[in-house]
Amino acid sequence: MEVFTKLKEGALLPEYKTSGSAGADLRALIEEPIILKPMQRCLIPTGLSVELPKGIELQVRPRSGLALKHGITVLNTPGTVDSDYRGELAVLLINLGNEDFKIENGDRIAQAVIAQAIQADFLQKDELSNTERGAGGYGSTGIA
C-alpha cells in the first residue's frame, strides 16, 4: 500500500526496522532537546503529514523499549490519524518513569501502524441480544 507523505525540512520518513515489523518508527522533529520530567506530558512534532486512502487509519502507538526502560508512552494510545486529516502528525508522550527523559531531534519516539477503519451504521434498538457475559465488564470475567 502506498501512503503519500509531506515532510518539513529535516523530517524523516517513517521506517520499518525489520521485514516483519508492523510499526514504522516516527521521529521527533524539534529544534532543541526536550526534557520530559516524571508525570509530564508533551506534544512532540514529527514534521510529517500523510495522505491515507479512504478506509485506512494510521495508529500512533508507543515503542515498547521506551515504555519498558524509561516509562515513556503515548498518552492517547493508540492515537488515530484519520484518512481525511492533512496536518502534521505530533505524538503526545508522557513520562511515567521516575527520572527525567531527554528527547532529541531525530529520536524514535513512537510507531505508526496502518490499519483498516470501518465506519459502521449505528442503529437504535430497545433491547440487545443476550450473551453469556451480558453487561459484565471491568474484571467480571476474572483474573485467572
Swiss-Prot record:
Swiss-Prot/TrEMBL catalytic activity: dUTP + H2O = dUMP + diphosphate + H(+)
Swiss-Prot/TrEMBL GO biological process terms: dUMP biosynthetic process; dUTP catabolic process
Pathway: Pyrimidine metabolism; dUMP biosynthesis; dUMP from dCTP (dUTP route): step 2/2
MF term (GO), any: magnesium ion binding
Superkingdom as given in the UniProt entry: Bacteria
Keywords: Hydrolase, Magnesium, Metal-binding, Nucleotide metabolism
Classification via NCBIfam families: dut (TIGR00576), PRK00601.1 (NF001862)
PANTHER family: DEOXYURIDINE 5'-TRIPHOSPHATE NUCLEOTIDOHYDROLASE
Protein name per its UniProtKB record: Deoxyuridine 5'-triphosphate nucleotidohydrolase
The species this protein was found in: Treponema denticola (strain ATCC 35405 / DSM 14222 / CIP 103919 / JCM 8153 / KCTC 15104)
Gene symbol of the encoding locus: dut
